[in-house]
A protein has these predicted regions:
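A helix-boundary/hinge signal
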Residues: 1-74, 84-87, 94-96, 100-106, ...
């Protein structure tokens, strides 16, 4: 906005008395915040009030025009007021869009009423009417503030003494070379961190968003760099002024009453958050080597599905092979809020983090202060004494480092004989960790249950991460002949069964039934009433269908293919909301058939994902990662891929053989880019073992010995001779691994996008739809033109096909029957316009 940068430049450049870089930055930001508030009040003011006044004056002028001609001054005033009204409406809509948090919808794709409604709904949802304490419910603001203040002062503001410590060498911890983490911060590094900041996230105590830092980088960069370099030198004077946060309480469930039913999210001061993000960016590339493979949260190239697929494969294998086992899900009490700082720093030192890095983490810890925001009002400030902030970019990484020793402790206990080994030969680990979701496989023995209780209690005393066994659960696998009442005598938790939920998905021993998938469909349908489709134009509904309704099943589709009935149910919801804005719509409301709508935009569709093709594209990643990353916990186990998935994968890849140990002789495309089973299909039918490696099949011509029966037909003889000749030129290279290349990307690596796109190979486009989507206009206009190009808008001819009331003649020119072609090009009225 005009004048903004001038105000920032003026306020930022005013002289200061202090020379301490951090205090200088704090004073400048506080002073600038006041200056911008004053400037906004003078420049913009109350937009809602101004907009209401402007509309009222315009209304009076229009009423006057009905009685008499307006004067020149009145016409000029009306012209200016209309321009002013448009500008104020844009500002108000943008402001309400930010408050509504519907950031995936553009301002032009929805009515301002929708943003108002969503903002009010969020406020009502997050408003805390009452809280429960030991004596009953409290309703007044003062009493609620006392309950909240006492709780956080006790849980975050006090630390507990450690009674035990760990022998890090016995657990296999050896210091790594992490000196590069302590290099000086460069201007490019800081600027990259600033550019990564989301522009419209919730404000911290200072009131500045990422958009401000990006827009004013040239003005503020010198002071920002000076403060960060001061922290690099471990001079933290004044940092406590900027390491503050406002804690907002978000309900975990609809009927939240206790303070524990709310999730505390810290809205940090932007400078402290920037510094934490700097450290997080440096640490992120090293996490893969620092954290065991049984843990996948917050680590690049690892996925939550890695944990689920490993556990799912283990459960199914143990059930199939009738191995009695207990699957235990652990509940860690307030994990992020209770981790002990001394323990966390011990973990960092054991891993090889240097003294400067550990001191940076200590500075972030010991200078942290917070205030709880209750219904928009801030409570008193308190100092932190333990835990890591939820909302701090560095906190998730520190937390997984703090959790990782649990896996090593359990493995050490197994080696020492305190726990008996898990019977399955494919079990790489008995533990699966994803942030604070922990799961363990245990043998159904009373001695193991007693031992695990002692180990978990000791881990809680060491780390502050106490396991709540009463809320933990045990799920037996093939334990029908075992006296579980005796085995679980000392276990006070929940005894469950399969299927059960783990990491948000159904963990099962057999195939999923309809009752297990139905909740997913219901959750998708439940999103529609809150959106009020009538306040959205079709482009806005398209954005919601593409970014929300189509994304909701993605987590499920990555592991489980949806049955046809489930896909149809979800498609019905998406189709109805797109065309009518409601959950149910009949065929007459749906202007274009669904297969056309779900094609990519450049192929004549609207770009809404086809769930069947998208699910297959997601599942191909398992086949790709099974090739390129053998360190995955599920490597070598059963994959959630069917024959069609494997056929598409083989057609989409090219294998370059080295030692022939990895590639499969018959299935992989390694022989001049083709698979031998396609070169010799008749011969392939005679093969006994179809999944052997190239190395085994070429050694002593093992592929010939693997043929069962006689080669009798002419086609079999021809294929045998052709394959024999081609194999004579193949020579393996011992010590060189086989490699695989994805055909549909420039860098040869798999991507979901390319796997989805290739499934439309052979499709044609009826018209140059790409010209529509490249046009410089609002999305609602693009969607309308796309519908008209398909000749599907509700002109008279289309109304006639549906049997709906209509006028035969064009309403604009009173000419022939109204059609899309006539309305767009042939109508004299349209051509004149």
């Amino acid at each position: 906005m005009e004048g903004f940068h001038e105000v920032v430049q003026t306020e930022w450049g005013k002289p200061l008395n202090t020379m301490l870089p951090i205090k200088r930055l704090h004073i400048k930001m506080a002073r600038l915040a006041k200056g911008l508030k004053k400037w906004r009040k003078e420049k913009i003011g109350n937009t809602r009030l101004q907009l209401a006044i402007t509309k009222e004056v315009l209304l009076q002028l229009e009423m006057a025009q009905e009685l008499r001609p307006l004067s020149d001054q009145e016409n000029e005033l009306r012209k200016r007021l209309k321009a002013r009204s448009t500008g104020l409406a844009v500002i108000e809509k943008s402001r309400m869009r930010q408050r509504s948090r519907l950031t995936y919808i553009r301002s032009g794709d929805a009515n301002t009423k929708l943003f108002h409604m969503k903002a009010n709904a969020r406020r009502r949802k997050n408003y805390i009417h009452c809280l429960q304490k030991e004596g009953g419910l409290v309703f007044s603001q003062d009493e609620k503030e006392k309950v909240v203040g006492d709780y956080f002062s006790e849980h975050l503001g006090t630390s507990t003494a450690r009674t035990l410590s760990l022998n890090w060498q016995a657990l296999g911890y050896t210091p790594r070379n992490l000196q590069q983490l302590e290099l000086p911060f460069t201007q490019d590094e800081v600027r990259h961190t600033v550019l990564e900041m989301p522009p419209e996230k919730a404000l911290g105590p200072d009131g500045f968003t990422g958009a401000f830092f990006k827009a004013c980088w040239e003005i503020i960069k010198d002071d920002l760099l000076a403060a960060i370099n001061n922290l690099f030198q471990l001079h933290s004077q004044g940092f406590e002024l900027m390491n503050s946060a406002n804690i907002v309480l978000l309900p975990k469930k609809t009927d939240a009453l206790r303070i524990t039913d709310y999730r505390p999210i810290s809205l940090m001061h932007s400078f402290a958050k920037n510094f934490a993000k700097l450290l997080a960016n440096r640490l992120a590339p090293h996490l893969n080597s620092l954290v065991s493979n049984c843990q996948s949260a917050f680590i690049k190239k690892r996925s939550i599905h890695d944990n689920f697929l490993y556990v799912q494969s283990m459960v199914r294998k143990m059930h199939k092979e009738k191995m009695p086992t207990l699957f235990m899900k652990l509940d860690i009490h307030k994990a992020f809020d209770t981790v002990n700082w001394s323990y966390l720093l011990e973990v960092l030192r054991a891993l090889g983090f240097g003294p400067r890095w550990c001191e940076w983490v200590s500075i972030l810890f010991r200078t942290a202060t917070s205030r709880v925001m209750l219904n928009g009002l801030l409570g008193p400030s308190f100092h932190h004494a333990r835990g890591v902030r939820q909302g701090d970019p560095l906190s998730p990484m520190l937390f997984i480092l703090a959790m990782d020793p649990l896996q090593r402790i359990l493995e050490f206990a197994t080696q020492m004989g305190a726990l008996s080994p898990v019977p399955s030969s494919t079990a790489r680990w008995r533990t699966s960790l994803y942030a604070d979701d922990a799961a363990i496989f245990i043998n159904p023995r009373k001695e193991d249950i007693d031992a695990i209780k002692v180990i978990l209690q000791a881990f809680g005393n060491i780390s502050g991460l106490h396991i709540n066994l009463e809320k933990s659960s045990v799920h037996p696998i093939r334990c029908d002949e075992i006296d579980l009442d005796h085995v679980l005598t000392s276990f006070a938790g929940i005894r469950g069964s399969f299927p059960c939920r783990y990491l948000g998905l159904q963990l099962h021993t057999r195939s999923l039934r309809k009752v297990h998938v139905q909740p997913l469909i219901e959750r998708i349908g439940q999103r529609l009433p809150g959106w009020k489709g009538k306040w959205l134009n079709r482009a806005g509904r398209l954005a919601l269908v593409s970014s929300v309704l189509s994304a909701m099943p993605t987590y499920h589709l990555t592991v489980f293919p949806l049955a046809a009935w489930a896909r149809k149910s979800i498609d019905k919801i998406r189709r109805s909301f797109l065309w009518k804005g409601e959950e149910n719509a009949n065929g007459g409301h749906c202007l274009v058939n669904w297969p056309t709508v779900t094609r990519p935009k450049d192929l004549g569709g609207l770009g809404i994902p086809d769930l069947n093709k998208f699910s297959r594209a997601l599942r191909l990643r398992w086949l790709w990662q099974d090739w390129v990353d053998t360190s995955k916990p599920w490597a070598g186990m059963e994959l959630p891929c069917n024959d069609l998935d494997r056929a598409l994968f083989n057609a989409s890849t090219r294998v370059t053989i080295g030692d022939g140990q990895k590639a499969r002789f018959w299935h992989d495309s390694w022989l001049d880019g083709e698979a031998p089973k396609h070169l010799a299909p008749s011969l392939f039918e005679l093969v006994r073992c179809k999944n052997r490696s190239i190395h085994l099949e070429l050694r002593n011509n093992g592929w010939v010995a693997a043929l069962r029966g006689q080669i009798t037909t002419a086609s079999q003889v021809e294929e045998f001779i052709s394959l024999w000749i081609r194999l004579q030129d193949i020579h393996l290279t011992p010590g060189t691994p086989d490699t695989i290349t994805w055909k549909w990307t420039a860098n040869g690596a798999y991507s979901t996008r390319s796997a989805y796109r290739i499934q439309f190979c052979g499709s044609y486009r009826a018209f140059r739809s790409d010209l529509i989507w490249k046009a410089f206009t609002e999305n609602k206009c693009k969607v309308f033109v796309w519908t008209m190009a398909r000749e599907k808008i509700l002109t008279a001819d289309n109304l006639q096909k549906r049997g709906w009331p209509h006028q035969d003649r064009c309403a604009l020119c009173n000419g022939p029957l109204e059609t899309c072609l006539h309305l767009a090009l042939l109508c004299p009225f349209t051509r004149a316009v």
